[in-house]
Swiss-Prot record:
Gene: Ptgdr
Function: Receptor for prostaglandin D2 (PGD2). The activity of this receptor is mainly mediated by G(s) proteins that stimulate adenylate cyclase, resulting in an elevation of intracellular cAMP. A mobilization of calcium is also observed, but without formation of inositol 1,4,5-trisphosphate. Involved in PLA2G3-dependent maturation of mast cells. PLA2G3 is secreted by immature mast cells and acts on nearby fibroblasts upstream to PTDGS to synthesize PGD2, which in turn promotes mast cell maturation and degranulation via PTGDR.
Keyword Cell membrane: yes
Phylogenetic placement of the source organism: Eukaryota, Metazoa, Chordata, Craniata, Vertebrata
GO molecular function, one term: prostaglandin J receptor activity
Protein name: Prostaglandin D2 receptor
Tissue specificity remark: Strongly expressed in eye and gastrointestinal tract (GIT), moderately in the brain and oviduct and weakly in the epididymis. In the eye, expressed in the epithelium of the iris and ciliary body and in photoreceptor cells of the retina. In the brain, expressed in leptomeninges, choroid plexus and spinal cord (sensory and motor neurons of the dorsal and ventral horns). In the stomach, expressed in the mucous-secreting goblet cells and the columnar epithelium. Expressed in platelets.
Any Gene Ontology biological process: positive regulation of cytosolic calcium ion concentration
Amino acid sequence: MNESYRCQAATWVERGSSATMGGVAFSAGLLGNLLALVLLARSGLGSCRPGPLHPPPSVFYVLVCGLTVTDLLGKCLISPMVLAAYAQNRSLKELLPASGNQLCEAFAFLMSFFGLASTLQLLAMALECWLSLGHPFFYQRHITARRGVLVAPVAGAFSLAFCALPFAGFGKFVQYCPGTWCFIQMIHKKRSFSVIGFSVLYSSLMALLVLATVVCNLGAMSNLYAMHRRQRHHPRRCSRDRAQSGSDYRHGSPNPLEELDHFVLLALTTVLFTMCSLPLIYRAYYGAFKLVDRADGDSEDLQALRFLSVISIVDPWIFIIFRTSVFRMLFHKTFTRPLIYRNWCSHSWQTNMESTL
């Protein structure tokens, strides 16, 4: 049988493989997303009666809620199949022998679907952050929570249609080593256009989304840095402008500490998101345009798939849990207060010197 992948037709989990990493990833993802949902509920996101005590949810939190639900569904649908394969020492194709290759195809579809849907929602969040900071007038007029609710369904519908193309004959799903993963086939010995074409198309779309997300985050970081510099050089004028501006960035202008929070989190998000997405994009292009020895490439493909799955684990911790007041308090006590005190001492010393002169 002329197969492109060593474990393509395997019926058992490859020896030497352990379920430890899969179990840890599932536990971390499940805990993070459940904790994120609890924090979102406590923040008043689910309130149906806006008012002084229950302000309407911001667009950002609506988008975060959609991303959290998407990641949680992905973890609950995908990870149990991996753990079941390890527990029974059977590959995905053999977990349900009567279904043939359907379970493997369903797993691969879910992997590609949730990977694309989450990336689209991450781009929407990055775009929302950039618009709110760099184009506040356009943001206030056109970006609303009601429109933000549509992001998750629209991203899901697009991802559903796109990732279902292999079922229509364009693209192919295949089982990867150690027999507990299935995903888009990224190499074909006969260089079939229908197989390689979908792999390149999927990876190209992911690359464009990653690039757009990084650009938006860098733009938002640039705006935050400019705001922070203005606050340091003109603290009184900035405070007066904040008080007179009424409703500004997300129902209230951020103070300098919040600006620093956002800057650090955006930088961390950009680095982690890029690191987790690029391995899969690289493997897809590498398999499409170079002759690959599958005996040497299976481990790299598995690592790329694992990196992709890390995004859904990291998302809730970065976007929600690290934004809570408890984390901010610890962060400010550890890093921000010494920095502010040092800057204040330097500014006071400079002022005293100028007054004596």
